[in-house]
């Protein structure tokens, strides 16, 4: 589930490299480093290698760099990683290496980028949303639904251990899922939003980033409990404005949850509205303005967005 989120991007650029799962906060790599720490490897080694390892997996997410000569035989290059992200039959489940390409050559998963097969990016079951929260949990929710719907006990159990894309026969027949059969017929997800709505989305994203840093800055003052609720507020906020860009009515419901979270925090602190600190005033004012903005765009653009999305699905 967690790597599908990274691959759900239908473009291949540096922004794609930043599309990571929420569960990345609990990284398997950190667990695997515990034995090294126990054996006495200095902490500065981890501090040095961490950023290097991160950058070495970041830079090759680009279509602008062609093949790199002899380096193609040593390190993972943009060409190698374009193959890894391709949904073409020739490229599926290939080039898993992160830094040194030798591992794919040793385990039989290496594939060179073919001149006559241009990689098509994304996933075989398109996410079809701009909402990162939905993208994070969509595949997991599908597994839960399939496990519940299948009639065979054995399928309810093994679905959690089968390869990606596997579904019980009875569920696949009764509840078909849109899957890309021919990569070159892929229709990239697109919503025909007005410039005003796109501008609203950019403003919302910018404010969310500022409020995120503000939450970090004020964490010592608020403590873990309140900081946790403010983090939840930010996640619901992202859910709200990306759902609005998707043309979904439940974006307004998410705005209601935002206001409820802030009201709970105010109630928990046992202070009146007039005595709120600046941080809380900003969060409350933003929640109200954001909700009014959602109401406006739902009223003026929802019919237009739904019409465009239906025509795209056809």
Listing of model-derived features with the role each one plays in the protein:
Residues 189-276, 280-306:
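Substrate-recognition/cap regions that form aromatic- and gly/pro-loop-enriched pockets
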Residues 77, 304-314:
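Short, highly charged, low-complexity non-transmembrane loops/tails of multi-pass membrane proteins
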Residues 54-55, 167, 263:
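A short structural micro-motif
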Residues 118-166:
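A membrane-cytosol interface segment of integral membrane proteins
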Residues 1-132:
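Membrane-embedded catalytic scaffold of the fatty acid hydroxylase/desaturase
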């Amino acid at each position: 589930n967690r790597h599908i989120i990274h691959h759900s991007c239908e473009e291949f650029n540096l922004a794609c490299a930043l599309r990571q799962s929420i569960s990345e906060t609990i990284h398997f790599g950190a667990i695997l480093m515990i034995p090294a720490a126990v054996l006495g490897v200095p902490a500065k080694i981890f501090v040095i290698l961490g950023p290097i390892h991160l950058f070495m997996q970041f830079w090759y997410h680009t279509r602008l760099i062609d093949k790199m000569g002899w380096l193609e035989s040593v390190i993972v290059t943009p060409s190698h990683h374009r193959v890894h992200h391709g949904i073409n039959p020739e490229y599926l489940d290939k080039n898993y290496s992160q830094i040194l390409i030798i591992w794919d050559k040793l385990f039989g998963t290496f594939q060179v980028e073919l001149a006559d097969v241009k990689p098509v990016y994304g996933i075989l079951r398109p996410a079809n949303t701009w909402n990162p929260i939905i993208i994070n949990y969509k595949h997991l929710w599908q597994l839960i639904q399939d496990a519940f719907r299948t009639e065979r006990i054995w399928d309810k159990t093994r679905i959690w251990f089968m390869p990606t894309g596997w579904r019980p026969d009875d569920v696949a027949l009764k509840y078909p899922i849109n899957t890309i059969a021919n990569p070159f017929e892929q229709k990239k997800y697109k919503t025909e939003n007005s410039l005003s709505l796109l501008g609203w989305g950019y403003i919302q994203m910018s404010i969310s980033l500022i409020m995120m840093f503000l939450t970090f800055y004020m964490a010592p003052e608020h403590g873990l409990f309140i900081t946790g609720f403010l983090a939840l507020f930010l996640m619901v906020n992202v859910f709200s404005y990306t759902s609005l860009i998707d043309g979904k009515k439940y974006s307004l419901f998410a705005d209601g949850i935002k206001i409820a979270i802030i009201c709970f925090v105010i109630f928990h602190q046992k202070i009146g509205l007039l005595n709120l600190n600046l941080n809380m005033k900003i969060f409350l004012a933003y929640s109200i303005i954001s909700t009014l903005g959602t109401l406006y765009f739902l009223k003026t653009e929802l019919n237009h967005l739904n019409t465009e999305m239906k025509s795209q699905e056809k």
